[in-house]
């Protein structure tokens, strides 16, 4: 239980090939849970098939530095991050009980390259009331990603900074809920408390292109929701994203997409970002080209941002400046 099973482990150097180019078997390369003090550095992990390269849950003090993740094979629309910072839930992370809802904390991913993988790094499932803390994703390169580069679900006190995201379908999503949202087996109160994320998304360079992505394209999205009543097994509660600072990012939109998108948020600061719209003559994408989109959000400030429009497409419906939608926008 907790972080007590695997301790003081180092992987240093070398290449591990998942052989996904030759065989259609799911092949996660490194997987662990209930762990502490794990270091993975100077490695190349390549050719996974419909799987993650590294997957872990209920871990603390994990450092992944100067590694290369490349060449994913398999279903293009699957939820396979090269590094999955996972939620320890029995239906979602099998064979690693005790399922005590231990979150991840003190996770550092730096100086890594993600190229030709389905997704880069992050978390796509969540347990109500379980938050991962002090997650640092900094100084990495993401190249040719057909899904998200970074997906941060239920993160607090975390930072996503100084990353280069090039030729990707979507850049960074930060959310306090998930489509795959599980109830707490410990038993939560009927209403979840409002949580301030106290996190930063800063100084990232993001280029969004058409990857025939099944969802909407965007540079940065913050996503949450207020549920006034219970839905299935999920209790009613405030699942909105609060307290995130978004500043100093450079976002280039090379298809009809959103630059920065706030949906179900509160007290967000969006400052001093540069968004360059470069929609081509034959526009692609599903979102209609809005620089900053705000839906059902309150108490946020958007100021000091620069918008540059060098688009060659003359359809004015494809680009809007700041769009406010909803009673609290």
How should these model regions be labeled?
Residues 7, 35-38, 56-63, 105, ...:
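Short "repeat-start/strand-capping" segments in structured domains, especially the N-termini
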Residues 1-15:
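Beta-solenoid repeat scaffold
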Residues 15, 34, 42-44, 58, ...:
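Short, structured patches in soluble enzyme cores that scaffold and shape functional sites
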Residues 1, 16-19, 275, 307:
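Beta-strand-rich extracellular passenger or scaffold domains
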């Amino acid at each position: 239980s907790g972080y007590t099973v695997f301790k003081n482990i180092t992987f240093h150097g070398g290449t591990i090939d998942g052989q996904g180019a030759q065989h259609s078997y799911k092949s996660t390369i490194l997987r662990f849970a209930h762990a502490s003090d794990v270091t993975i550095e100077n490695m190349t992990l390549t050719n996974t098939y419909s799987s993650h390269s590294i997957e872990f849950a209920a871990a603390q003090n994990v450092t992944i530095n100067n590694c290369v993740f490349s060449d994913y094979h398999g279903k293009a629309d699957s939820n396979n991050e090269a590094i999955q910072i996972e939620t320890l839930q029995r239906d979602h992370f099998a064979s690693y009980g005790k399922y005590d809802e231990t979150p991840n904390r003190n996770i550092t991913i730096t100086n890594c390259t993600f190229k030709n993988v389905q997704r880069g790094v992050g978390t796509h499932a969540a347990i109500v009331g379980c938050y991962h803390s002090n997650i640092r994703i900094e100084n990495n390169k993401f190249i040719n990603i057909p899904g998200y580069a970074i997906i941060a679900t239920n993160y607090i006190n975390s930072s996503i900074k100084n990353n280069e995201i090039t030729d990707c379908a979507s850049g960074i999503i930060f959310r306090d809920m998930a489509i795959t949202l599980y109830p707490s087996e410990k038993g939560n109160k009927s209403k979840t408390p409002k949580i301030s994320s106290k996190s930063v998304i800063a100084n990232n360079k993001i280029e969004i292109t058409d990857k025939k992505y099944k969802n909407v394209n965007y540079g940065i999205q913050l996503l949450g929701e207020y549920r006034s009543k219970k839905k299935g097994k999920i209790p009613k509660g405030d699942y909105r994203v609060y307290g995130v600072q978004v500043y100093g990012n450079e976002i280039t939109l090379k298809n009809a997409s959103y630059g920065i998108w706030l949906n179900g948020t509160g007290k967000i600061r969006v400052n001093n970002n540069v968004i360059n719209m470069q929609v081509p003559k034959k526009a692609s994408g599903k979102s209609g080209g809005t620089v900053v989109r705000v839906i059902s959000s309150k108490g946020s400030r958007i100021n000091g941002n620069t918008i540059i429009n060098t688009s060659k497409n003359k359809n004015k419906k494809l680009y809007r400046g700041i769009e406010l939608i909803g009673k609290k926008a």
